[in-house]
Amino acid sequence: MANYFNTLNLRQQLAQLGKCRFMARDEFADGASYLQGKKVVIVGCGAQGLNQGLNMRDSGLDISYALRKEAIAEKRASWRKATENGFKVGTYEELVPQADLVVNLTPDKQHSDVVRSVQPLMKDGAALGYSHGFNIVEVGEQIRKDITVVMVAPKCPGTEVREEYKRGFGVPTLIAVHPENDPKGEGMAIAKAWAAATGGHRAGVLESSFVAEVKSDLMGEQTILCGMLQAGSLLCFDKLVEEGTDPAYAEKLIQFGWETITEALKQGGITLMMDRLSNPAKLRAYALSEQLKEIMAPLFQKHMDDIISGEFSSGMMSDWANDDKNLLTWREETGKTAFETASQFDGKISEQEYFDKGVLMIAMVKAGVELAFETMVDSGIIEESAYYESLHELPLIANTIARKRLYEMNVVISDTAEYGNYLFSYACVPLLKEFMTTLQTGDLGKAVAEGAVDNAQLRDVNEAIRSHAIESVGHTLRGYMKDMKRIAVAG
């Protein structure tokens, strides 16, 4: 198999990278009806598998779970989750031949083995579904020509997919049809019905492509969503302790600071996040973010280049073949860092204190979000896709750090995201070492001193913040998400 994207000519690559259309709500007037009365078999019962299945069943669909024989015989976690929730469970051989739609929600590294097992069992004219297109785009999996291949990719962890559905809402979602596998022209109808069954149509759906979803998803998770948060956590903790801050206080300021800061980002974009600062602090955060963007731009561009070329995927798949040696080594090293092993401060940190004493963290968020967005757009990805893969998902990832630090983040995200996160953070930490020595009092751990502010400078900074392209597209897309619940848990 060959990387699918690399088999396309330049015109085809650009067309698929740039495929992105925000779908009108009336396009989902039929809800999940196209799949009602049909058999949907989900392979895998992890966070996405279970929670999408629960939503789809509650939307009136016939859902069952196909698991490996040994998972059933040994009553593994996937079997327990499916059976405890009242789902029919069977082997591939028992369930797949009757399925109208087989949804592959196993981890990326298992996709080829799963497809190799289920494809011969699928009936003529059935459909195969994914929630991430890595197997199709990067691995270049070849699917039988009579099979329709679709994708429904919720832009949230599986737990959020379920919680928002239970509230009568949903999470923003990308849908796509693989152009090489739509023999009956029904791919879009299947994808729309599946998205509606999960509740995604209530929060906004983008019609995308497998290529655009994969390339933007990889870029977001490697840089701002995971890599920047990990690098920032390690750098900021070490700096605070070096300056004499109690390690326990420093740990709490960072662990819960990302979440508190990005909750403002979720509600009102970079503009609201920056507006939570005093005027002198806002000017300083803006200046720091501009410095960070200049330093980190080549690193962001390298990650995008390696994603576009397939270099990243090739390296990661080589590590898969080597029993995840690099991934497991990096995971162990991260677990031994001073930030991960520090005790936690017992006292309370107020919400505003996280902003006032986290100016550098705010600058890192602003710089990382804007750089990820700009780099994706410069590579041909449409602004709406770039927004969802940068700013939108950041509060959700920050929330995992608030639960159990970097360990929890790396457990919750996919192995693909974790591998890319380590590549970025291992490069970013030394890259910013010299910058960290230039920090001033008030940048981190202490509030910026009050002082005179130049009105013209403040006016220009406010205009620069609000006029960035991500603020414009974000204002529009957040309009569809006003009902999403607040997720921050910091105390």
Curated annotation (Swiss-Prot):
Record flagged with keyword Methyltransferase? no
User: Which residues participate in Mg(2+) 2 binding?
Assistant: 217, 389, 393
Q: Where is the KARI N-terminal Rossmann domain?
A: 15-208
- Gene Ontology annotations of biological process type: isoleucine biosynthetic process; L-valine biosynthetic process
- According to the entry, every stretch annotated as the KARI C-terminal knotted domain falls at 209-344, 345-484
Task: Report residues binding substrate.
Answer: 414
Pathway(s): Amino-acid biosynthesis; L-isoleucine biosynthesis; L-isoleucine from 2-oxobutanoate: step 2/4; Amino-acid biosynthesis; L-valine biosynthesis; L-valine from pyruvate: step 2/4
Q: What does this protein do?
A: Involved in the biosynthesis of branched-chain amino acids (BCAA). Catalyzes an alkyl-migration followed by a ketol-acid reduction of (S)-2-acetolactate (S2AL) to yield (R)-2,3-dihydroxy-isovalerate. In the isomerase reaction, S2AL is rearranged via a Mg-dependent methyl migration to produce 3-hydroxy-3-methyl-2-ketobutyrate (HMKB). In the reductase reaction, this 2-ketoacid undergoes a metal-dependent reduction by NADPH to yield (R)-2,3-dihydroxy-isovalerate.
What name has this protein been given in UniProt? Answer: Ketol-acid reductoisomerase (NADP(+))
**From which organism does this entry originate?**
Enterobacter sp. (strain 638)
Its encoding gene is what? ilvC
